[in-house]
Amino acid sequence: MANHRMSEATNHNHNHHLPYSLIHGLNNNHPSSGFINQDGSSSFDFGELEEAIVLQGVKYRNEEAKPPLLGGGGGATTLEMFPSWPIRTHQTLPTESSKSGGESSDSGSANFSGKAESQQPESPMSSKHHLMLQPHHNNMANSSSTSGLPSTSRTLAPPKPSEDKRKATTSGKQLDAKTLRRLAQNREAARKSRLRKKAYVQQLESSRIKLSQLEQELQRARSQGLFMGGCGPPGPNITSGAAIFDMEYGRWLEDDNRHMSEIRTGLQAHLSDNDLRLIVDGYIAHFDEIFRLKAVAAKADVFHLIIGTWMSPAERCFIWMAGFRPSDLIKILVSQMDLLTEQQLMGIYSLQHSSQQAEEALSQGLEQLQQSLIDTLAASPVIDGMQQMAVALGKISNLEGFIRQADNLRQQTVHQLRRILTVRQAARCFLVIGEYYGRLRALSSLWLSRPRETLMSDETSCQTTTDLQIVQSSRNHFSNF
């Protein structure tokens, strides 16, 4: 009994101060035959055997009560194969299990179990897996915490989108109205553009037809000997610049007829001065257009303008430097205009006098240029004729300057007449000018379109009359016999 009590006391003390080596030796090493007879005594030590059995049972219970490292509830950690799915780890809080009376009362056994658990080594794979899972769980926690804030803000702000939607619907109606109006304007602009394009194409076609008609008339005039040039067919002698000018001049004549009809209608309808002023200003702008066309044509072919093939035959009778004389135009106006004040008459006569002086100066300059050209071409060449022709070409190029100065004089005369006269007098003045040149063109058309049979009948009648006179005179001569 004494030996048994001592063994219990020893067991109690070992529960508190049991060395780790003894426990490790008891767990891993089986008692050998030498252990019973350790002290060399033949008696069997039941106290030591009881102590070993108790410690082995305590270790077994602690291992059963020890929670798993990464999982709870007996489930092992599962690794999901899809990277988008988080790795689920089951962590369980340590729960106190009811232990036996020896474990609940012995604090030493609890310390021993905690020490043994902490001292148990962990496998390398499990530690590596645990380190890889920890940042992943942290990132998931951060993302869930950050995504949780906008979700709450979105749940708190449903009224604001409804207000924005209401505003959008009201502004959408306004935008729809603006869009419809703009679409209507675009359709109208496209329609007008198509009409202008169609009119331009028709105008080009009519100009082409008129150009072909002019070529036919020129060819017929050359065949009849009425064309003064008389140097072959018109095709090779007309340059591209001259042909373009003829086409543009034909278009200008059409616009001139339209402006004349507007002025005539305005005067007959007794329009107001403001409305009539618009018509007169439009005609002046139309009159300036012909001078611009002539300036372009003079650079291309100055002889075409000087000869005046672009004009009607009756107009060519009064041509002066590729146009009309301003002084002759003023004479026509003075004879046709009435109810002019003395101041207006003085201004018109002063304009006529200055125009005549400018015409004489330009005419003298043109005569000097012609004489210089004659002297250059008539002089005998010193070495060869190339230098002589170069000088002659330089003198011919001066013709363009004379044409430009003559057109400036005509343009200034028309603008001065507009300043001297009133609006209605200016409208009447331009109507007289337009009708005068219209009659000249009509006279030329009548003369060119006269039938050939009339000419033949006139020649036949003249020849018959001559023959009759000869016969009658011969009869009278032989009547005495």
Curated annotation (Swiss-Prot):
- Note the Gene3D superfamilies from the entry: 1.20.5.170
Domain DOG1: from-to ranges: 242-450
Q: Kindly give the SUPFAM superfamilies that the UniProt entry links to this protein.
A: Leucine zipper domain
Which molecular function term from Gene Ontology is one that the record holds?
Answer: protein homodimerization activity
A single Gene Ontology CC annotation of this entry is: nucleus
Region annotation (Leucine-zipper) maps to 204-218
- Domain bZIP residues, every copy: 176-220
Instruction: Describe the disruption phenotype.
Output: In the double mutant tga9 tga10, reduced male fertility due to defects in male gametogenesis, with early steps in anther development blocked in adaxial lobes and later steps affected in abaxial lobes. Microspore development in abaxial anther lobes leads to the production of inviable pollen grains contained within nondehiscent anthers. In addition, multiple defects in the anther dehiscence program are observed, including abnormal stability and lignification of the middle layer and defects in septum and stomium function. Reduced SPL levels in anthers.
Keywords recorded for this protein, A-Z: Activator, DNA-binding, Nucleus, Transcription, Transcription regulation
Kindly state the subunit structure of this protein: Homodimer. Binds DNA as a dimer. Interacts with floral glutaredoxins GRXC7/ROXY1 and GRXC8/ROXY2 in the nucleus. Interacts with TGA1, TGA2, TGA3, TGA4, TGA5, TGA6, TGA7, TGA10 and PAN.
Do you know which PANTHER family this protein is assigned to?
A: TRANSCRIPTION FACTOR TGA9 (PTHR45693:SF9)
Described function? Together with TGA10, basic leucine-zipper transcription factor required for anther development, probably via the activation of SPL expression in anthers and via the regulation of genes with functions in early and middle tapetal development. Required for signaling responses to pathogen-associated molecular patterns (PAMPs) such as flg22 that involves chloroplastic reactive oxygen species (ROS) production and subsequent expression of H(2)O(2)-responsive genes.
User: Record's family?
Assistant: Belongs to the bZIP family.
- The protein's name: Transcription factor TGA9
**Originating organism:** Arabidopsis thaliana
